[in-house]
Amino acid sequence: MSEREFEAFLKEAEGDFSTTENWEDRLVLWQDKLQVLRADIHQWLAKYVEAGSIVISEEEKTLIEEGLGSYTVKGLRLEFGHHIISITPVGTRLIGSVGRVDVIGPKATQRLLLVDKTASEPNIATYITPNGEVEVFEATGQYFVKVDWAWKLATRPPEVKYTHLDANAFFDILMKVVNG
């Protein structure tokens, strides 16, 4: 490959992100929904925090994602008994969801996905272009600003299902990541 071909390749790559998503809006949505999740967790655990059974602290993490660059997110650290649970944002550049947060305990990890509130499973389509390339996208199209997004518990692949996240579901998640 010549230097001229490489420069043309780089120039073409620079335009890839501007046509598919407004990444600034996506990052704002992601940060806002992370704040909502943290607030929900604080609310669900408030009586246990007040009783001194659980300690909640915030943890900052730097993520680097293609199209978004480097940015800081806040997760949570829960301490109770001799257990430490980390609620860690993973990213927003995902297929089938607008964001993922892992709930990591000593014996298991559970995945929370930011998906369409009405979804019970992923709605993803693949398309093979005339030149043989495979493209994967949400079957519903590019509409992320118009969707009512909600945090849901996602089962492991290959048959991913979503469960509504509320206080009881969150308590179950905590018990699973501690007990396995």
Residue ranges with predicted function:
Residues 2-3, 23, 34, 160-163, ...:
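Intrinsic-disorder-associated interaction segments
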Residues 17-62:
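Contiguous, amphipathic alpha-helical segments that mediate oligomerization or scaffolding
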Residues 61-130:
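Hydrophobic-cavity lipid-handling domains and compact docking modules
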Residues 112-180:
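Glycine-rich, aromatic-bearing surface loops/beta-hairpins
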